[in-house]
Amino acid sequence: MLFPFALMKIAFVAPLPNSGTNRYYYRDIWQGMRAFQAEAAEFNIEILDFGFSGPLSSLPKHLEEVYQNHCDEISGLITLAVEDPAFTYFIDQFSKRSIPSVFIVSDLPQAKRLCCVRAQDLMAGSLAAELISGFTGNRGKALVVSGDIMVSTHYMNATGFEQYFAKSRSRMEVIKIYNRKEPERLYIELLELLRSDPEISAIYSCTATNTPPVCKAVQDAGRAGTVKVIGSDLFQESREMLLAGVLQAIIYKKPFQLGYLGCKALFNFLVKNEFPKSDSIFIEPIVLLKSNLPFYECDIAADNAYESI
């Protein structure tokens, strides 16, 4: 006779996908989480939605709220990592209560987590640099537009990009720009740079969030096609820009897999008592060009995908 599984609750703390620019990336992560939740329904798993709006710097505050109000009812935690003492403190507090944490998207190895599921960000940056090297013949200046320097996935992308050119001893000048989800400010800054500096020959947007304002600035500066642009992740706007020739390629980090595999790793540990094979589970990025885009277009989520899951 089969006995029903006791209800097990997992806290999922991540930026909401239905507010502003978060929809470009986090929507797929939430879809991955919902897909795994549906698959694991027979095991009586409930994933508690603690989505939040606002900057990632507010994440420790949301973890504090979960810890204070829900610590007695949850068996595990899935969240992102930020380099903030308050974040590390609350992850340690969860660990002391025997609540394992799985990180997705970004890592902080010194924190007490079970594992991290993330894109191979150094590889993503290196792939973008190699593409730009080929597109430009290593001539001119390359801008690498990243996100929040407190988030490992952002600065590791930029690092991988820089390291490629350093190892190849290229004369190409690399200029880093960090933008904390302020697309209009980024657009204005890039537009001024593109209009004033004819030596800019390439741009790599490390994040999905920054890809649309990068494309708009290149278009409005009248330099689409001449400035080679590599975008990040696949969504309706990036697809259109690739087909229009504003983007020459997309580095696709498969965010759906981050949400899905993060839940699976924690589920296997809690339900099956299986430890992850590694404390770092990497998703290998894919280079999308016009020629292979049709094979991945089915991955593009509808605008109402989060609400319909």
Specify the residue positions occupied by each region the protein language model found.
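Short beta-strand->loop
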Residues: 15-16, 118, 143-152, 178-179
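Anion (oxyanion) recognition and catalysis
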Residues: 95-96, 166, 243
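Hydrophobic alpha-helical
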Residues: 66-70, 75-99, 161, 175-239
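Alpha-helical recognition/docking segments in bacterial nutrient-uptake
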Residues: 5-123, 127
